[in-house]
Structure formats: C-alpha cells, structure tokens
Amino acid sequence: CIRDSYAGVLSAFGMGVANIEWHGERDAGGADVAGPLPARWQTAFEEIEAAGRSALARDAGSAARWGVHRRVALRYRGTETALDVAWGDPADMRAEFEALHRDEFGYVRPDHVVEVATLRVVVELRGTKPDLPRVEPGTNAPERSTQLWSEGGIVTAPVYRRENFPIGVEVPGPALVLDATGTIVIDAGFAGLRDERDYLLVRDTERGEAREAADTEVDPVLLEVFNNQFKSIAEQMGVVLQRTAMSTNIRDRLDFSCAVFDADGGLVANAPHIPVHLGAMSESVRAVLEAHPQSEPGQVFVTNDPAAGGSHLPDITVVTPVHDREGILRFVVASRGHHADVGGITPGSMPPFSMSLEEEGAVLRNLAIVEDGEFQEQTLREALGHGPHPARNPDENLADIQAQIAANEKGVQLLAALLRRYGLDVVEAYMQHIQDNAADLTARAIADLPDGEHSFEDAQDDGARIAVRVTVRGASMEIDFSGTDLAVDNNLNAPRAVT
C-alpha cells in the first residue's frame, strides 16, 4: 500500500487528487463474440462516451485529461452470470472471459457460444497529480522501542517519527511510524520504504509464504479459530451457490447444503444448512473417492445415488477433490442441492407410488462432469436423459449444477488461502483436532446419559415394522435396528446414509 502524509485527514488528500469516473452501458442483444459483430456497436460506444463526457464537463477545466475505457459483459449463451472484459479482438475477449470464468467458477466450456450481453464505457476525468515538495532526510533513527503483539506473541518493535523514517531504505516489520494524523503499523512479513516525496510504501515481503506461527499440537484458541475458519468457508460456498443458481428451490427456498471434508471424506465443517443433507454427504464423498481413487486436479464429480450416500434423487451432490501442487489429494469440498426435477413418473421426481428407482428419475453415479477444468456438458445431458423417465428440464439442472461447481470452487480458493496463511501441516492437523474434539464432545454427552437399554417400535402406513434398540454403556451408544422389516416394494425405504 502507499500512504501519503495526509491520509489521516478524512482521506481529503486522496479524494482531491482522485480520478472522477462516469459509467454508462447499453444492451448488446446477445451477439456471438466470435462475430461478425454488429456495426451499430461502434455508434453505441461513441454515443455512450459522448454522454459521459457531457456529464463530467462541468468538472473539467481547459487542461482536463480524459480517459475512456470500452468494455463488454460476456457470458455463456443460456446462462445469467456475465463477466466484464476489455473491448478488443474477439479471440482476446473470449480468452480473457474464459480465464476469468475459470478463476471464478472453476470450469470453462470451450465449445459453447460466448455472447455479448452488455456494452460498457467508463469515461474518466483524470485528477491532477500534485507537485509535492521534496523532503529532507531526518535522523533515520527510531526515537524509542515498544512492545506489540505480532505473529502470535509479544515482540519489541522500533517506533519512528515519520520525518525521521529513512528515505530510500526498506525497514522490515514489525515497526511503528507516527505522524501528525495517525499511526502506521508495519507488521512482520512487511517492509516500509519512504520516498523523497514523503510517500510511505508498505509491501509484502513474504508473498505466497505461510506467515502465521502455529504448531500442529492442539491449542484451544486455535481450535476455535480453525473451527470457525472451516465453517466460514462452507458458508461462503453457500453464498455463491445461492447467488448463481437458477431454480427457485436453490436460489429462493435455499434447499442446499455445503461442507468441507478431509481427504478420506470425513466431515470437518459445514454451514448451518439442511441436516439430512449434511448427515449423509460424507458417504457420497467417500463413494466418489472410492470410484475415482486417482482423481486429478481439474476434476469435479456428481452423484445422487441413494445407495452411495444420496437421499432421494432430486438431491444432487457435486464433489470437488482439492489437490496440492504435487497433485496429492488433501481435502474435498461438496455441495448438495434439491433440484426441482430429475425425471420420474411425476413432475418433481417424488412420485407417491413409485415401485423402483428408475420411476423416480435419472440416477447419477459418481459421474465426472468437469475434466481438466472443462465442463462435460454432453456427458451430463446424456446422463440426465437416460432411462425411461428422463429429466424434464435438463437446462435448469445444468444451470444449478454449474452453480454448485462454482460454490465448490469458492471453497477450493478459500482452502488455498488458508494453506498460504498457516501451511499444510497445521491445516491438516486442525482438521483432525476438530474431528477429535467433536468425537470427544459426543462421548461426553453420551456419558451423561444413564446406562441401560431402550426400545421403541412403530409401523409405517403400509404396516412395515420399524424396531430400534438403543444401548448406552458409559461413553458409547449402540443403535440396533434388528427386528425392522426388510425393504418393501414401495418408496418408503430409507437409504443407509439417511438412517
């Protein structure tokens, strides 16, 4: 960052020299970016620019310096989310769009049409850079030292007056710089440099390295920190899923769940979403890992199989393995969403009188839907269209699954940021500590119950018997369904993961 000597004065100096921008846009009609592009767009750009110059004219003097930036919002045809790129050569625009799309959503569709949704122009009235006087060197020495908290402990740091901070020499953090309107903290891992115009430049000297000092041994404070970090990752995945989904079920009813898992498919943390999703998702993740033991970076999988961790077929789970730079599987992120329809003998894919799974819709069994970062649209369409009762609106299924892929990609990015901050050993250790702590708390809760055996029986509407016996011994509990009737010839059977 760059900090001038007036930065503490209500940011007035920065506002006074900042550029003034005007933004205008016009609908582009959805033409293919590959061309030919409509000739009327040139006229549209010129008209938008003229409107911007007119709007800023009263702030422009005779020596005004103008800047104009033409941009377009691109999207894959049939989708809602558009990304801004610079106007230019069609091939360059598509390349920039796909790079942004891969970073934001985790995949690209190289064979799909990219359309121009919006024409945009930014008209800029550039501020005047002040001719600040050169400053004379001071003593170049700190006036004293003080103690402050940095990198998990108390450290001794030099305290400089701004006028005595060295010119042209980097000072490593931790350090404090005092001026008339504020205090600047140069943290560990950063360095400060004052130039001859009295600007103080603070830069990251350990970019890309893990800087947080933390041990792999469990610490109660860090346990809570990591618990909330992982939970926050799942919550932010949910925000992306809600924002990018198309269906009412996911976008408005919020019938979805997101979670973070270890490399074995064990649940580490989840957002406060749908309990039946979260309790069963680990089995779906493990089923994917067993079906694809050699998963590679850039792969994403989908499943809704009730025999492998699913619930009912409309609940579709998207699973993204997370690998390190050497291609070793380290974590997994997953999202499950209730799709409005996946086929079956009735709309909604929850028929009251179905007698087989295929009567409830399309079954997706650990299917790879992203390979090497490319979305496998045709493969997924064929799977949704398979069987006697295919999905009724596969376009909506695809849109929501793409939203789930994007949500997972957010989780991948946030886990990568956590690794940069703490390092792999610490992150993996605290995943295990969180799981151990959860097991310990559960055991304590069971230990508070009196030892003994408790039984209950009930029957479904069709007369099928359900029997359960719970036996508590110390800190352990056994739940036994012996005596329950076998699976029946209707749709009232519970998958093992949901039981």
Task: Please tell me what each predicted stretch does.
Residues 3-499:
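C-terminal, non-catalytic interaction/recognition modules in large multi-subunit enzymes and RNPs
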